[in-house]
Amino acid sequence: MAYSFTEKKRIRKDFGKSQSILAVPYLLATQMDSYREFLQESVPPAARKETGLEAVFRSVFPMESYSGNAMLDYVSYRLEKPVFDVVECRQRGLTYCAGLRVRLRLAVMEKDDTTGAKRVKDVKEQDVYMGELPLMTEHGSFVINGTERVIVSQLHRSPGVFFDHDRGKTHSSGKLLFNARIIPYRGSWLDFEFDPKDHVYARIDRRRKLPATTLLRALGYSTQDILEMFFDMETFRLIDGDLRYVLIPQRLQGEVAAFDIVSPETGDVLVQAGKRITVRQTKALSEVQGLHEIPVPDSFLLGKVVARDIVHPETGEVVVQANEPVSGELLDALRKMPSLTLHTLYLNELDRGPYISETLRIDTSRDAHDAQMEIYRLMRPGEPPTKDAAQNLFQGLFFSPDRYDLSAVGRMKFNRRVGRDEITGPGVLNDADIIAVLKVLVALRNGVGEIDDIDHLGNRRVRSVGELMENQFRLGLVRVERAVKDRLALAESEGLTPQDLINAKPIAAVVNEFFGSSQLSQFMDQTNPLSEVTHKRRVSALGPGGLTRERAGFEVRDVHPTHYGRICPIETPEGPNIGLINSLSCYARTNSYGFLETPYRRVVDRRTTDEVEYLSAIEEGNYMIAQANSTVDEHGVLTDELVSCRFKNEFTLANPDQVQFMDISPRQIVSVAASMIPFLEHDDANRALMGSNMQRQAVPTVRSDAPMVGTGMERVVAIDSGAAVVARRGGVVDIVDGARIVIRVSDEETLPEEPGVDIYNLVKYARSNQNTTLNQRPVVKVGDVVSRGDVLADGPSTEMGELALGQNILVAFMPWNGYNFEDSILISERVVAEDRYTTIHIEEFSVFARDTKLGPEEITRDIPNVAEGALRHLDESGIVVIGAELAPGDILVGKVTPKGETQLTPEEKLLRAIFGEKASDVKDNSMRMPAGMYGTVIDVQVFTRDGIEKDARAKSIEEHELARIRKDLNDQYRIVEEDSYQRIERQLIGKVAEGGPNGLAAGNKVTKAYLKDLPRAKWFEIRLRTEESNESLEQIRAQLEEQRQRLDAVLEEKRRKLTQGDDLSPGVLKMVKVHVAIKRHLQPGDKMAGRHGNKGVVSKIVPVEDMPYLADGTAVDIVLNPLGVPSRMNVGQILETHLGWAAKGLGKKIGAMLDSEVAMAEMRAFLAEIYNRSGKKEDLDSLTDQEIRELSANLRGGVPMATPVFDGASEEEIGDMLELAGLPRSGQVTLYDGRSGDAFDRPVTVGYLYMLKLHHLVDDKMHARSTGPYSLVTQQPLGGKAQFGGQRFGEMEVWALEAYGAAYTLQEMLTVKSDDVSGRSKMYESIVKGDFRMDAGMPESFNVLLKELRSLGIDIELEQSK
């Protein structure tokens, strides 16, 4: 196999047994593809599919005036180039977006007076601006107002029809009440339901119910039509007063015979009256000849329901209406008529209930008009119904494409559920649809068919960014449509253009609201690269049109068999959102309908093939699917007698011959975060859940350290997240410094019109959304040859192109003086000294100078009443200098605000006369460092409003930025120029010249020496013999010139952006942003965790010499409590510890071999022993000796291992690795007490564990208040760190003081230390004077209580006791 540039530097030993035939797909594909489909930016207008934006425009346009004489139609749209790029938008607090220009055609018609036909009078076509559309960055996020946001995908109930029952909870008898619900993509919901009396009702939009037959009548069906649709008929004939029954023997099966059934041929009694008719008798009856009609007694007909109106043949009068039961009188009346055929409903107790017939009896409406009026009263209570209004409302509910849309998905689901073969159809409902649903519902009540499982992933679909945005855009456009229709009337008379008709504000408002405040638009979790990826792959059941936390029951949150390979069963938040917010599995993707699907490899005749097929949850149920770790031989044939499979959502064992598909990979069922946990299969699910969630909270450390025991997913996440910089094209590294990498692209990857240079500007100490540091470091050197896709630079939490969330730490599982009681963690001082867990956090402080009523605020160094020492960090503009080390209270930006004129005392007037005006009319309003925060200034940005002169600091920042851009462009031009001249040189040397500068005579050959002496600019003056060569030279010259002009234009554009004024919010004249870097060392109180849900808080940092140590003197770094393992059942951490120790031991062995300079052959043999003993085989022979030497050097710190989830290293393999490293196979060793030097009395498990430092840092949580702000009403100190609040001395604490009888302490607590306003200020004075007496006054909260009582009308007065 071919290794990439960084992979060959440090190969990860892979224990995986199952061969992977499909690489993990691009992790952000769901987001990227969805938005790309929505915008179709790069697709020419004529070729665009009708999805996304295009679909919205096509569905809303054309807009017609009410008279029909003017029409506005859509032609196409285009997106303009964004004004600012992503980085600039982040800095300036802008939205990264592009203007949307829509080409519209306005046609004005006129009527021909003679024919009445319309003809086009005037057509205008114009590009209309329709607001701005946010663009997605190349990593799947959006920049909105300068912050990165993610639009989370929503998992909602798919449109279609669903059948369910109430699980017997509604009625006390426990009877199952069935219901059906037709859910459209947009429009009114239609429900049908049974009540306890078995009547069928309909509800529209969950309003009051009405009989379902009312809806059928409104569709124009009569009672007879309805009965014929839902029931089979029984036929009776009255011939000369005799009643005969048309016999269908199958219908008698299971019934009790009401009379003797006699054979007409023999006269034998075939079935005796009162006996139940068996299957055998039914069969015998069907074989008897002449038994088509049998005479029956009148009692057999009585009570049956008439199915069709009976009309008197002579008078034409309706004698009996359909749906009437047959009574004795009715039968007598019918007998008076000549011969008659009577149809009744075929009903029975078991599977032919009279539900629709019974419902018709309670239905008060008689015809379509009545029914529509009834529906109108239900939908618009209080409004007087008219025939037209009722008809229009009913038509608009389910049958109008403007108001109702099932969508392609809904139609497909609907047709499949009601048993139709065709899966396409109209987006609106029709009569047949409603009848089909009722038929299925009645069949369910009759015991035929099954209800739907709403938690099945075939009934829930994913709405991603593109679709959510499409819905919002449609909302905006519909609002615009209303206004346009009103204005179109004017277009006819006043000759308006499309631009005049359209106001884009409603669209902009809807889009901004969606991105700014929708529940699904979330502030991106940027703690580390994994948290970014996970956030973009999240699927939420909450949000508009989804569930709410309070209403969601247990079933919705639970893991469903269809989640397999689609949604991770492990990763979900703890707390109220559990199960409602999920993560996509590694290989999952959405299909064209929005259903999640997962890949499987096809199995044919026991043999696994490389053919991959994606199946959705609906399709998957029909196949027998084997697990990924089923044993196969070298030919890919399943060898086991029985294979563990899934079939129809159940787990089963099957014969290999029945297997049709097989999982792609064992990690298929889990999400990205869960697949990063080694030995996941040995952890309890609850702890694995914590492990996956806590990895997302790991803070990037100053020195990244990739895990020695990983899972092989580390590289995928680092690259797909965008944290690591990846080469766009292959080539040679030309320049590398800390902030950028310049690559000279290889010729075969350069197109003629493209520059042959790629410049990668690295992100340096930028602030993430969570205030962690985003910093990239190059991993290549000048001269390195890189290919496309190779890692050029590491980002935050990545090392050598692999994700590195924490540190490999030497851990011992043992108690240590109680300092690791209850999950506490004991740490060695060495961990802190080596900066293993030191993190840098960047805080951003923004200062605004506003225009106030009293005059403009000013950012200045001239601040009243501030000592010169306090200004030591400020430059002449009053802004802190970069590199200043600040402490709490230090001034970051000096700002003065004008204050109103006050009446001055004579002394102040004298002082003002002496010292000038300035001192009194402004007050200090400077931005200072908050309490408890120490840090270094690393960046300052100054934004000035257009028309206001920039200060010196703003100008110097501008010049610095311009110089950086110029340097980039110069390098780009230099490489392109260098490349061009090399091509010219190759073309000129050895060619015969026609003439040239410096006396080059015609007929002479051009030599290298001649070119060396000739200035390069004059090379183009050389004329060659062949015209073709001259043209080629001219082409290179033109390309070079064009490139220079293009780069000049880019520089000019950048200069214009930098020098123009900034667009600040109203009233703001100047904005200064200061970034302060804060270094946080590991300290007691910080939260740490492993990857197995083993979390704890640092309790003590112990000197190295006191820590337990191994026999060779190595002190352990961290001591964990062994009691944290058995009850938590996360044994994965123990296996990781053992394998980590083996990895480290092998690294030490390799280091020793390098130091003793063994032969390369010996080194290769040892590496082969490590890499190829078990698991995946590595192709070490493809590496050169130099590469093997570099690989070995990188393995000194430990051989990185990968144990993929559900396919990892076995206990046996871990033991082998420990032995190979020369360590005890048990993984345990005798430790010695650092303080006494004595050996502990039993061996201790020791090894390397990957530990993370989480974002719950004690510095962010702890604070101490001296004096600070008070609540306005109660005058008690505020609470919480953000308000610089105090510790609440609450009710229970007061009880404690009362119990101890500490009266004076209690009085202090309730008065001067809390809300006795005058008392606390006196207290301050008395402390200053050294007088420690105390007079307690009235607490303010008592006054509040009095006011509260008085407001209730109870007068309370306080009287001084005499």
Swiss-Prot record:
Gene Ontology molecular function: any one: ribonucleoside binding
Record's keyword terms, sorted: DNA-directed RNA polymerase, Nucleotidyltransferase, Transcription, Transferase
Enzyme nomenclature, EC number: 2.7.7.6
InterPro entries: DNA-dir_RNA_pol_bsu_ext_1_sf (IPR042107), DNA-dir_RNA_pol_bsu_external_1 (IPR019462), DNA-dir_RNA_pol_su2 (IPR015712), DNA-dir_RNAP_su2_dom (IPR007120), DNA-dir_RNAP_su2_hyb_sf (IPR037033), RNA_pol_bsu_bac (IPR010243), RNA_pol_bsu_CS (IPR007121), RNA_pol_bsu_protrusion (IPR007644)
Functional description taken from the UniProt entry: DNA-dependent RNA polymerase catalyzes the transcription of DNA into RNA using the four ribonucleoside triphosphates as substrates.
Family statement drawn from the similarity comment of this UniProt entry: Belongs to the RNA polymerase beta chain family.
Binding partners and assembly: The RNAP catalytic core consists of 2 alpha, 1 beta, 1 beta' and 1 omega subunit. When a sigma factor is associated with the core the holoenzyme is formed, which can initiate transcription.
Catalytic activity: RNA(n) + a ribonucleoside 5'-triphosphate = RNA(n+1) + diphosphate
SUPFAM superfamilies to which the protein is assigned, alphabetical: beta and beta-prime subunits of DNA dependent RNA-polymerase
Protein name listed in UniProt: DNA-directed RNA polymerase subunit beta
Gene3D superfamilies per the UniProt record, alphabetical: 2.40.50.100, 2.40.50.150, 3.90.1100.10, 6.10.140.1670, DNA-directed RNA polymerase, beta subunit, external 1 domain (2.30.150.10), DNA-directed RNA polymerase, subunit 2, domain 6 (2.40.270.10), RNA polymerase alpha subunit dimerisation domain (3.90.1800.10)
Gene designation: rpoB
Coiled-coil intervals: none
NCBIfam families, sorted: PRK00405.1 (NF001616), rpoB (TIGR02013)
